[in-house]
Amino acid sequence: MTASAPITQDVLTLPRKEPEGGKINLVGLTRDRMRAVLIENGTPEKQAKMRVGQIWQWIYQWGVRDFAEMTNLAKAYRAQLEETFEIRIPEVVSKQVSTDGTRKYLVRINGGHEVEVVYIPEDDRGTLCISSQVGCTLTCSFCHTGTQKLVRNLTPAEIIGQVMMARDDLEEWPTPGAPKDETRLLSNIVLMGMGEPLYNFDNVRDAMKIAMDPEGISLSRRRITLSTSGVVPEIARTAEEIGCLLAISFHATTNEVRDVLVPINRRWNIDELLQALADYPKVSNSERITFEYVMLDGVNDSDEDAHRLLDHIKRHNIPAKINLIPFNEWPGAPYKRSSNNRIRAFANIIYQAGYASPIRKTRGDDIMAACGQLKSATERARKSRKQIEAEAGVNNS
């Protein structure tokens, strides 16, 4: 790795060590892993697959956290489960509600770390923006989250637990046996919170497979969007192993500018990224790629930039939508938002070329919940590497 290259996800990714003698958390386990731990702890092997199906529905379809409420299981078996297992999700530390209805949650995970989660209600959908890491390695210069150093990856339980936490707050778990209601307050997930999802690929994949499981939360893969800054080797895996919609934090049309705005571009440049994006819809059956483009005054918002962006997309034959994002300023930000007239002119060039170019409506900026503004309280009390290693049970002496 060269000195100028962004650090990768393995710098502070440490093995997690559960406290000895503690209960096993069933949240975040794959079906196969849940079956294995049930067998290891006394469930007859012939019954294990059926038990997984029953417990899975109670946890992910009905939102039940107490084994005693799982009434299609024998009382003795429920007691056995209670002795060994738990159903634990991240703890809500605080909740802020914007004047536009946006909700920002600060949630605490293992080790006392905190991440932020945002729920955005709209007329036709409700979108939950979730985090995949504590902090971030990418140091994108326009992003507040990028000023917080990476602490660690989130586990599958901590990722899917954000979805479960939001459903708790929205009181959206259905009653067992009640008629199915297709109207959802939480209908979409976007992996656009803290962290780079593709630097935590395996855990993100496992969590999203739980979200998509038809016997649980049951979200269509068309209602899940993963946003990446351009971890090129993992884009193909995302198409094959998750198959969700893909958004790319593009933000610049030349390598010179993107190297500054999105430093991962020094590792995989624009041409390498565009080739990976061109292949994605063929594998995932996605209709199009979303290009996210933050509008920065005098930096990337010229007519020439708009035409270059179109040239990139057309040259690689990428089915695309371009989301233009007015820059959400934060204390100490080195950039200013492009004027409304400049944003509209840029959008019109894209639109006249035949591409959708919606201008994202800023949501939750009064509570620092808007795009690029997330930064948890963990930054104010960030722990040293030795403290993190000690929590993880790693001894490097």
Swiss-Prot record:
It holds the Pfam family RlmN_N. The keyword Coiled coil does not apply. Keywords: 4Fe-4S, Cytoplasm, Disulfide bond, Iron, Iron-sulfur, Metal-binding, Methyltransferase, rRNA processing, S-adenosyl-L-methionine, Transferase, tRNA processing. Its main location: cytoplasm. One of its GO terms (molecular function) is rRNA (adenine(2503)-C2-)-methyltransferase activity. It is found in: Cytoplasm. One of its GO terms (cellular component) is cytoplasm. One of its GO terms (biological process) is tRNA methylation. Disulfide bonds join 129-371. The active site is at residues 116, 371. Its cofactor is [4Fe-4S] cluster. HAMAP family: RNA_methyltr_RlmN. PANTHER family: 23S RRNA METHYLTRANSFERASE, RADICAL SAM CORE DOMAIN-CONTAINING PROTEIN. Belongs to the radical SAM superfamily. RlmN family. This is Dual-specificity RNA methyltransferase RlmN. It comes from Ruegeria sp. (strain TM1040). The gene is rlmN.
